């Protein structure tokens, strides 16, 4: 996901550079502002994904502990 976002950001920067020859300064400034906004959004999404990773790992750990407790109970009953 991060690589895809970098490619998109690179395409936006490249596109704005190519358009610089036939654009006014106001349009260039607007594109630059848009790129900065997109960069901030990409960074926020990356932070959100990283936060979710730790939550997912915690949920996996809880599920593994619950499954182990169930396995232990079944083993005792069958014993």
From Swiss-Prot:
Regions annotated as coiled coil: 28-69
Subunit-structure text: Homotrimer.
GO biological process terms held by the UniProt record: lipid modification; periplasmic space organization
Listed GO MF terms: lipid binding; peptidoglycan binding
Family (UniProt): Belongs to the Lpp family.
This protein's GO CC annotations: cell outer membrane; extracellular region
Induction, as annotated: This gene is probably poorly expressed.
Domain of life: Bacteria
Record's function text: Plays an important role in virulence. A highly abundant outer membrane lipoprotein that controls the distance between the inner and outer membranes. The only protein known to be covalently linked to the peptidoglycan network (PGN). Also non-covalently binds the PGN. The link between the cell outer membrane and PGN contributes to maintenance of the structural and functional integrity of the cell envelope, and maintains the correct distance between the PGN and the outer membrane.
NCBIfam families in the record: Ala_zip_lipo (NF040598), PRK15396.1 (NF011925)
Keyword set, alphabetical order: Cell outer membrane, Cell wall, Coiled coil, Lipoprotein, Membrane, Palmitate, Peptidoglycan-anchor, Repeat, Secreted, Signal, Virulence
One Pfam entry name: LPP
Lipid addition sites, S-diacylglycerol cysteine: 22
The keyword Glycosyltransferase is annotated on this UniProt entry: no
Mutant lacking the gene: phenotype: The integrity of the cell envelope in a lpp null mutant (double-knockout) is not affected.
Per-repeat ranges for Sequence: 25-35, 39-49
Residues bearing PTM N6-murein peptidoglycan lysine: 79
Membrane topology: Lipid-anchor; Peptidoglycan-anchor
Signal peptide: 1-21
Sites of N-palmitoyl cysteine lipidation: 22
Designated name of the protein: Major outer membrane lipoprotein Lpp 2
Locations listed in the record: Cell outer membrane; Secreted, Cell wall
